Amino acid sequence: MPRSLKKGPFVDEHLLNKVDAQNEAGTKQVIKTWSRRSTILPDFIGHTFAVHDGRKHVPVFVEDSMVGHKLGEFAPTKTFKGHVKDDKKGRR
């Protein structure tokens, strides 16, 4: 079920403060965050976030099409190595 419109999008306060500070200063440094649950706002466009995936920080550059999604959607937590080929000749 989606979040109520009356509540508005959820963004961690510390993350919003970091983005506002960079917007005022006019800088575009990488913002390291563990907040995968924060919604991407239009103020975030053009910034790069280092989103934690449980092991390392994945760089995510925010574009127009990402607004309204969560930061965690762009930093996958599981690495898919591929399926092993069923090679019965090699087992003998």
From Swiss-Prot:
PROSITE patterns the UniProt entry points to: RIBOSOMAL_S19
Annotated Gene Ontology cellular component terms: cytoplasm; small ribosomal subunit
Family (UniProt): Belongs to the universal ribosomal protein uS19 family.
Pfam families the record matches: Ribosomal_S19
The protein, known as: Small ribosomal subunit protein uS19
Presence of keyword Iron-sulfur: no
InterPro entries assigned to the protein according to its UniProt record, in alphabetical order: Ribosomal_uS19, Ribosomal_uS19_bac-type, Ribosomal_uS19_CS, Ribosomal_uS19_SF
Keyword set, alphabetical order: Ribonucleoprotein, Ribosomal protein, RNA-binding, rRNA-binding
Source organism, top-level taxon: Bacteria
GO biological process: ribosomal small subunit assembly; translation
Its job: Protein S19 forms a complex with S13 that binds strongly to the 16S ribosomal RNA.
Cross-referenced HAMAP family: Ribosomal_uS19
SUPFAM superfamilies named among the record's database cross-references: Ribosomal protein S19 (SSF54570)
Single GO molecular function: rRNA binding
Record has Ribosomal protein as a keyword: yes
